Curated annotation (Swiss-Prot):
It comes from the Bacteria. This is Large ribosomal subunit protein bL20. Pfam families: Ribosomal_L20 (PF00453). GO terms for molecular function: rRNA binding; structural constituent of ribosome. InterPro entries: Ribosomal_bL20, RIBOSOMAL_L20_CS, Ribosomal_protein_bL20_C. Gene3D superfamilies: 6.10.160.10, Ribosomal protein L20. Belongs to the bacterial ribosomal protein bL20 family. GO terms for cellular component: ribonucleoprotein complex; ribosome. Keywords: Ribonucleoprotein, Ribosomal protein, RNA-binding, rRNA-binding. HAMAP family: Ribosomal_bL20 (MF_00382). It comes from Methylorubrum extorquens (strain PA1) (Methylobacterium extorquens).
Length: 121
């Protein structure tokens, strides 16, 4: 049986790692062992932050909505409650975009939601 030499496969693996480490600083970009660790850590950060991105954007939409709704004399929590009571099912992302790009339409949504709130409050 012929002897199997692993030069081709290991070279391909090393090339793959170094390609992924392109743009890194210092020995992280050209030393296999260090580059491998750096790439692995980078992939861990990427995985973690893909999850965190969803939380971050939701928080951003809520901040924007809170600011926009306060201009109309409501707080964010009362606005969301009013939306639920009036049966308006629009997500926070869409409401945030509406508040930024279509202020008149957003004002109409706020007024519709306000009408669902009890007058005593």
């Amino acid at each position: 049986m012929a002897r199997v030499k692993r030069g081709v496969t290991s070279h391909a693996k090393h090339k793959k790692v170094l390609k992924a480490a392109k743009g890194y600083y210092g020995r992280r970009k050209n030393t296999i062992r260090i580059a491998k660790q750096a790439v692995e850590k980078g992939l861990q950060y990427a995985y973690r932050d893909r999850k965190n991105k969803k939380r971050t954007f939701r928080a951003l939409w809520i901040q924007r909505l809170n600011a926009a709704v306060r201009e109309h004399g409501l707080t964010y929590s009362r606005f969301i409650n009013a939306l639920a009571q009036s049966g308006i099912e629009v997500d926070r992302k869409a409401l945030s975009e509406l508040a930024i790009h279509e202020p008149a339409a957003f004002a109409a949504v706020v007024e519709k939601a306000k009408s669902a709130l009890p007058k005593a409050a």
